[in-house]
Each structure stands twice: as C-alpha cells, then as structure tokens.
Amino acid sequence: LSAPTSACYDGAVKVVLTGATGFIGGAIARRLLDRGDELTVLVRDASAASALAARGATVTVGSLLDPNAIARASRGADVLVHAAGIPSPRASARALRWTLVAGTENVLSAARHAGLERVVTISSADVTLANVDRVHWDEKRDLAQLPIGERARALRLAEEIALSTSDAELAVTAIRPGWVWGPGDLSTLPELVREARSGGIRMFGDGRNLVATTYVETLADAVIAAARAPGAPGQVYYVGDPEFLELREFLQVLSRTLTLPGPRSGPPFALAYPLAVVRAGRGGATLPEEILRRARSTLFDVQKAIAELDFRATITVDEGMKRLATWVSELGGLEAMLAQARPLPDDATLEREASAAGA
C-alpha cells in the first residue's frame, strides 16, 4: 500500500502520544521534544506529565479505553504514536486484553476518526515467543501456532489488528523491540534489582544463550524514523542493539552497573521449563514465558529497518549502561528507584475506566 504523500515530513511534526508517562513512551516523548516536534500526550493523570508540560507538551487527560478522548487529543496531529502497554506477563489476562488489544483498537479507531494519516505502534519480539531459538529471524519468519503466554498472545493480536487496518488513508507501522532496557524503567528493572539482591538474577542453565536487547532511546529513535519513512506503512520492523550478547554477559554488565550481585546459574532449561508448564497458574510460580525469554536464544535480523527506515542503532550497551547508572543516581539511588516502582494495572481500575468511557 502506498503512503499518503504528506506522511513524509521534513520539518517539525505534530505528534500525539499514548503511554507518555511510562518507560518507552517517556523516552519517545523526550526525543520528540528534543527535536522540536509539537507533542500532545494522552495521560490518565496530568500531574504525572508535569515535566513534559514544562517542556512544552500539551497534556490531555483521558483513558486508553476511551476512543473519544483519544480522538480529541489527536485532532490536528500528523502522527499518533501508540506506546502504552503492559511490560509484565504477570498482569491478569483481562488487563492484558483490555490494555493491549482493546486499547489498540481504540487508538486505531480514534486516529481514523480524527483524520490522522499515520500511526506507529510499539509491538514486541514476543509476538513470536515459542519454545524455539529465534536466531537470525527476520520479519518474514513466523510461528505455526500462537505465541506462548497471555501477554505474547495479546501483543500478537494487537499487532495483527494494527497492520490489517493499514490502508491508503491511515498508514500503520509496527515496531518490534527485543528486551527493552535503559533509564526510566520503573517496571521491569525494580523486579530485577529485587531478584539480584536475593542471590543474583537467575538464569536457566549457564546463560550462554543469545539475548536480543533494545536500548530504550534506540527504540525511540526507530519510532521517529518509522513515523517519517515513506516505505513504512503496513510494515513491521525488528529493532535491536548493535551488539550481540549472551544473556550472562548482559546480566553481568547490568549487575555491575547497578553494583548488584552477579547473575546466578539455575536449573537447566530441560528441567525448568516442563516444571513451569505444570505449575502454570499457581501464584508466585515462574511462568513458562519468563523461562523462554531467559533461556532460548534470540537474535533478530534488523536489515529491513536499516534499508527501509534508514535507521541504524548506534548506542552501545556500554554507553547505555552509563546513562542508566546516571539516571539511577539522579533518582537518589536504587532505594529511591524501588520506592517509585510501578504496580501492575488491576482489573478494578480498568473496569472503572471502561465504564467511565462507556465501553
């Protein structure tokens, strides 16, 4: 499908952003403001976006479950970037479906209603999560079955809905990052810190499997490139760091950066995974998808993003770790970061938002 001709922008762009007070959305918001783009953010709590407002962003209060609020925020914009999501597979299945699937449907409906020409949505490499190594996989490689885990399946459905919506009037692009890490992470990183303090971040086996990582500012830059690229509509792109690391290498560097105990070897995958499958659904048990993400090798081919988005990751893991350490220090250290850790969304809150929106 061809893109609307005005979807390729040379100057400042008017962008509406969901998830701007979160980890990934926050990085995208800062990048857009650094560039001088005109930014409107849709947030549930205006006070959480005060720093963005101070930098010139327009703050609109509304829920992802309210397509009318999204449409109001989107009027006059060129691009909508959908970065709201749930990073943890431990959220309830209902919360995952409401936020990831229904939220994406609402964003797309609102964007079309508001007359936008382009949407860029953040998907995940987990849409192909399975009990297989995914080494040198590109966007053409797919699973013969649904991915493993409620979150992965919800992400997969949301991505399919988004890409099937793309047409000559509303161009939709999906970005698939790997393990997203870096400054601003108040969801996954606090959990890793607690785990490290309990004896080290656990691996399954010796951690010699490859791990596909994506520094958060690299992801933000890829999103901006996708919003401007003429060949992006209706396409999906893997985005990752410029280095290929084994899990143990990445966790060693992360632990050292945060002055935490190093990662620890755990039971072999051949034992841990079947046990997790049997125990799935029991409170507190390690989820099968959590083991897959840490034990199976992942290395995604990013040549399509290089060729079609003119985007190439340049921030090294070492540089990203330095920025992560600076952010933690500016927060006041690990204890201050842990105090700000974000809880998982609960069903009751989402139901209230849906009811208020008439969903």
Predicted ranges, named:
Residues S92, L143-L146, R194-T214, T218:
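A conserved pocket-lining segment of Rossmann-fold NAD(P)-dependent short-chain dehydrogenase/reductase
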Residues R97-T104, L108, V120, R151-L155, ...:
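Short alpha-helix in the Rossmann-fold core of NAD(P)-dependent oxidoreductases
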Residues A225-T286, V302, M321-A325, G332-P345, ...:
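Mid/C-terminal beta-alpha module of Rossmann-like enzyme folds, strongest
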Residues S47-A53, A57-A102, N106, A110:
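NAD(P)H-binding glycine-rich loop region in Rossmannoid oxidoreductase-like domains
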Residues E105-E150:
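Conserved Rossmann-fold NAD(P)-dependent oxidoreductase catalytic core, especially the SDR/UDP-sugar
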Residues V15-R35:
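N-terminal Rossmann NAD(P)H-binding glycine-rich loop of SDR-like oxidoreductase domains
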Residues D133-V180, I201-F204:
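Catalytic helix-loop patch of NAD(P)-dependent Rossmann-fold dehydrogenases
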Residues R153-L157, D185-P190, G205-A227, G234-Y238:
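Substrate-positioning beta->alpha
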